[in-house]
């Protein structure tokens, strides 16, 4: 699109948080026609707003009032359940540890929200994500200036065509500057904590939440020699590298070193734990992925030397990426990686450019 800003209508996904609020303010300052949209993605049915949806809506309304813009609302809870939450449960049932934020971006924020915004007459949508997009030629997903807050890890699965109609107004800002702008603008949320964790779980214990939807299957915990050293409550409640909550201690044959989850044996319903943070079973050098989702739908020539992350905010890790057939890749890291977790995502970078990623299927 080549419209001038004053002729360009942008609908900002406003969560009630400081980031999306400042995103809207920056677009107004740049001369765009701006409206907000508050989306509700989870219908609480237990009488408690774990998602703090009502508080968040009030915060978004306060900001919209200060900015003098219209605030739309939309309920995407049905789409969220069908496209995100059902997959989340299926992955946990299969013993993997999914990342629903990645799927939420792909299916809700950059699909359902974008489609709805277009029906409202938007030329673009905008969000408070810390990311940048190059709109020269084919859209490229670029890291944010604030590398500590960069969220390209969570955006890698979004179809690149969606970025042609997306603006990221915070991509060139550091977080402290965002809070300063919010305070300067008179936003009540300028000191509001960043949201953490999964919205629909909120402050509840993860185990308490998950057992509402999936029946637990308790079983044995074994050490790396096959000795039974405890009992687990259900494999789905544990993630690789986890230390807390194992209930192992005081074994006469063991040292005082802490125990960590090293593996899940799904066939036997056994959790395997090892002692010591540097135990070899906690590390892997190679992973195999599910089919890749390249941002530009074009894979680089493989094998390729790239950097990768297997979790958010992890420092870039050097690796060689090789074609494994059927759209999958094999990743060989320069250094062994700790607690690489099936169900999570590996995301690839070439300098500042986020190339894409895939769900981790297995490690070696």
UniProtKB/Swiss-Prot annotation:
This enzyme's EC code(s): 2.8.1.13
Superkingdom, taxonomy of origin? Bacteria
**Top class in the EC scheme:** transferase
Query: Which cysteines are disulphide-bonded?
Result: 104-199
Task: Please give a single GO biological process term from the UniProt record.
Answer: tRNA wobble position uridine thiolation
Quick one: a GO cellular component term? cytoplasm
Active site location? 104, 199
Q: Where is this region: Interaction with target base in tRNA?
A: 99-101
Note down the stretches annotated as region Interaction with tRNA.
149-151, 311-312
Q: Which residues bind ATP?
A: 13-20, 39, 128
Family, similarity comment? Belongs to the MnmA/TRMU family.
Name listed for the protein in its UniProt record:
tRNA-specific 2-thiouridylase MnmA
